[in-house]
Amino acid sequence: MPKYTDDDIFDDGAPQVAKGFDRGIDYLDIAAKLKKGLKKNYKVLQDTESTANAKRFAGSRVIYIIIALLQLKNCSRISEAIVATKKFSVSKNLNERVVVKIAKSEKDLIDRKTKDKIHTKPRYRDMVFPVDLVDTKIFKYIVKTKYWTKFCEFDSPRKRVLDFLLGHYECNTHSLRYAGINYLLNVEKRDMNVVAKFVGHANVNQLVLYTQTKALDEIFDRKIVV
């Protein structure tokens, strides 16, 4: 029998193939699961027999799910979704868009050639409230509660939403963003330039890389019938 060294089998030093941020989350499937979770937890809040502790958990979950659905609908970064949710909480018309600063658009860089410092100007994008995914009655209710007040006081709200998604839906916030992008590109067949503009990319480079990775996965997963 041939002999194999550990390096042959366990090549820890081998370069990793870039897989992007996608975690194989289906847009419609995760949207349905989140909507179901939203209704379930809202029901706990409305139940007069629910304990204070049960309502506390349900209140937090309602907020996290609404933010997740808003992120999914807009294919946004989680920080953008949180800012948008806060803006919608004081909006008189949830059918109107809000404007948020695109995360990481404003930053300090070093020019590789001149070594000069470069400060990029912030860019902004529109966000819509997911009225097709979130009952506005639930949203208007939750933003008037102590659970919303406490959420707005958190130092790291992004981590709380992320931990909730990982623990209850086995996905992360990047998964939601790219599930939405995947749906726009591969199901609705939207133009890549339009999608890049919608999600806040400065160009289509990242989307090209993403679609190439998805296409590569499809080649690996293809079934050959003989």
UniProtKB/Swiss-Prot annotation:
Stored InterPro entries: DNA_brk_join_enz
Keywords of the record: DNA integration, Viral genome integration, Virus entry into host cell
Annotated active site: 97, 174, 177, 210
Record's keyword annotation contains Lipid metabolism: no
GO BP, sorted A to Z: DNA integration; establishment of integrated proviral latency; symbiont entry into host cell; viral genome integration into host DNA
GO molecular function, one term: DNA binding
Keyword Iron set for record: no
Similarity remark: Belongs to the 'phage' integrase family.
Purpose of the protein: May catalyze site-specific integration of viral genome into host or helper virus DNA.
Protein name, as recorded: Putative integrase V10
Species this protein is from: Sputnik virophage
